Amino acid sequence: VIKHKKAQWPWHGLTALVLVGLAFSLYMATSMISYEWRWNRVPQYFAYKAEEAQRAASYGTVQDIVISGDNARVTLKDESGAEQVLDVDKDSLQLARGDDVSEGDQIGVTRHWAAGPLAWGLWTTLWISVVSGALGLLIGLFAGLCRLSSNPTLRDLSTVYVELVRGTPLLVQIFIFYFFIGTVLNLSREFAGVAALALFTGAYVAEIVRAGVQSIAKGQNEAARSLGLNAGQSMRHVILPQAFKRVLPPLAGQFISLVKDTSLVSVIAITELTKSGREAITTSFSTFEIWFCVAGLYLLINLPLSHLASRLERRLAQSD
């Protein structure tokens, strides 16, 4: 085993050289078009120091100013004698003791860290992926079992659903769901986007479930029935646990695709990760830097998901 691992090191080194070569080629390509890299503009789109103006509530006078480090505590007294105390950053203070102030005058600002557009876009992508993925799994499990049902109506309806959804583009489905169904039922764009993604994912999960159940030998079901289990108990306790091990890889692949498909909901004005990236480019003019960051954030979501699915698959295989 040790010899085998040592023999693989040159190949891993070659892989690293290829990746370095690709990165260098990309750098040279950008140099040829005179692109100027501005990575220093990117961090503010993840987190930045937000300013919140502190204003006088009424007419009055600056009664006292107490400086403490980088902060200043300003005490205002109005005509009735009531006091208003404001904490502001010292360098933003615009008044001195004894100055008169009017209602709405800015005394200074307070600064605090706030999430930038890319951070909010990442959060939106995550919650849309989780919610639509969970709903899609439930829809797909139900539709997949309906496709195997002995009831012709359930089988026909589930077949129509699966073929209709799989046969049309997701982008078209989002438009139909938002502009037609959403208008009739007065749905929010977030609800429409999640519903469209869930129905789309459910159709593919249904086919994965159907194929997984059908891959289990019929003898398994017959053996379960011979032990006194009914059809539902046989499916729940015997067939589905075995099928789950087989459908785990395609299910993981489907959910990874779902994370990337969330970028399409930007067409109905949902500011997820891709739309946040486009908006950041319009103000930073750092096209390549922003898109590389967006791609990296998608990888940050999908690589752990893929790794988790692989580990779960190996653990289930060891339990056999």
Predicted regions and their residues:
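Transmembrane alpha-helices and adjacent helix-loop boundaries
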Residues: V1-K90, Q94-R97, S102-D320
